[in-house]
Amino acid sequence: MVHVFSRDPIRMNETSATDLAALLCSRLCHDMLSPVGAFANGLELLATERDPAMRENCMALLEQSATISTNKLKFFRLAFGAAGGFGDRVPSEEAQGLIAALAADKGRIDTQWAVADATLAKPAVKVLLNFAQIAADALVRGGTLVVGAER
């Protein structure tokens, strides 16, 4: 939690919003650095490698890095951006798929989906995704992430 102290409540809100945006951008960049860096390293290795078996392994790692990057960007777009269309509700299966992909990318995390509604309010989906990300980060040794929501 970030606390910004100011006697001017307007300035405090502006500073807090700016600090929050900076922290969010730092988090997104941090989360994307690993798979994008692995992709760059794989391309460099692929350019110098001549052994067909090693080149095949490089291609598999490149595909894995691209998939992880894509999954994270889709997750971030809905969790922090304006994704989900123009409606007020988002199909719950979209959030379920993003959380499952996030857990799969981290490895050793199983997910259980306990949301009965076919759609959820867009703000609720954003909160659900953020809580799921925090919980997945806390499962450093693996485990089961149970995701639920009710009205």
Name these PLM-found stretches.
Residues G87, T119-L120:
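Glycine-/small-residue-rich active-site loops that bind phosphorylated ligands and cofactors
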Residues V2-L20:
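Conserved signal-transmission helix
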Residues A47-A53:
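Short acidic helix/loop segment immediately C-terminal to the autophosphorylated histidine
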Residues R55-I109:
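Conserved DHp (HisKA) dimerization/phosphotransfer helix of two-component histidine kinases, i.e.
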Residues Q112-T119:
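Conserved catalytic submotifs in the C-terminal HATPase_c
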Residues M32, F39, L46, L62, ...:
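Amphipathic alpha-helices that form helix-helix packing interfaces
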